């Protein structure tokens, strides 16, 4: 075993030499009472230092005992236990007075609550009210988020200062940016969406005013203005009202003002109706939330007030229109016994049909039962008749002859792959009908059929011009049947006289009626119409134009309705743009024509009353002695006596 070196006693430095004992301060609180506090962090720190020193001493003792070996006596263990108990007791005695001093100090030191004066007692209620926003604020915040998405570079997010843009405050008198707009929304500075729209325009206009057109800021402002106006358009706002719940609750500026006034008046009434003996704090009253019934009552009152305001505005508009009409409109109530059967709730009526075609009961040709009434609508199937389709088996396909040119002696001469008849039948068909198509001959024949009257009409028109209508008269005379007693000699004499008259008339008026001749040529011999005035001529031209438009409309409708719809469509094809345009032109022409004539020239009085739904009261039948049941009963003898004597008597 090696020799162990003993440590010199001078090398042992107890913990007390390095750690200074904490100083104690005496605080006098409330006069005679004294409390001791150490300059350390607390009495707990001083006890910590003492525990550490005792722990080091205990370690040294253990080392000495190990060196002595197993020579210890059992009585030493008892002394060790007693010493340990005393040390523990001494530790507790040292710690106890410090803790008591701390407790006394805590009890005697006055407590100062440092509460910020700005924070109210009911902070939770105020915070809850701050979170709740009006529908207008939620709508504006939604629009602001959409607008800011159109500014990815954040050019308009914060205010512009002179440090960023020199001379900005001198050029732009009313600056605007997204942060300012958000602050105004938070402070309820906007009363309508139009105000937000104006500020947005101002922001973009300021950027376009300060920057040059070739800069990125000018281009970004122009692009943002274009996209922002689409977002703030009425169509987009209406679509948002349908898709977002709080957008549907938007009210106009006037309605919001009415709501504020109504809420103020409601608060005053509720405040006056409360018991005066109950003291209510002002702050507590401000943060109290209203009951559901109170909210519902306020909502009903608000709706009633808004309805009354809308009626008042409509009444003001009606009065203004009556004043501006210059006597054409009046508020006088007509003392009439007629009533409108088709009258709308707002007091207006419409003219159903100008010239009614539907017959009513009692009129000639009236049919009370129609096919549509008995059969009803088609529940299944297609909306068109089944078209004719030729069976493929009825189609004759002859053989096809092949021609390979020279040096093809052993090649097949015809191909019967797709033929359904024999070669002999094919030869018979080819020899009868040939191989050339007859489309050209058919087209010429169709052209001659359609235009055979045109050359004759042109020739007759030219002859009428040269003979001043004598040619047409001669044709009419020739076409009329001659009398049976007239012979061939008389016919030849009549023809000679007609020819002489035509030649004389041709020589007399050769140079005087050139304009008339041209008009006759353009009208293909039709007699020219002469009008009494220029207005009548214009009216007739308008009628002719309307007639032409109606024919074109009919042709367009026939073309659309006769077109076979695709198999995937069940309903009929809708009217085309051409039909809509023609119908609009016809309507405008008829409207202009109807304005130039009196109503009696277009339709009868009965027709107008029937179309408007005006029912005339029946005459009083008390004075009449006619029995109205005669038409529905069997014919009987009826003796009618004047009412002064007695009523009608039936025998």
UniProtKB/Swiss-Prot annotation:
Residues 70-105, 271-298 have a biased composition (Basic and acidic residues). Its main location: nucleus. Residues 533-564 form a coiled coil. Residues 131-235 form the Bromo domain. One of its GO terms (cellular component) is chromosome. GO terms for molecular function: lysine-acetylated histone binding. One of its GO terms (biological process) is regulation of transcription by RNA polymerase II. Transmembrane segments: none annotated. Residues 58-69 have a biased composition (Basic residues). It is found in: Nucleus; Chromosome. PANTHER family: BROMODOMAIN CONTAINING PROTEIN, BROMODOMAIN-CONTAINING PROTEIN 7. This is Bromodomain-containing protein 7.
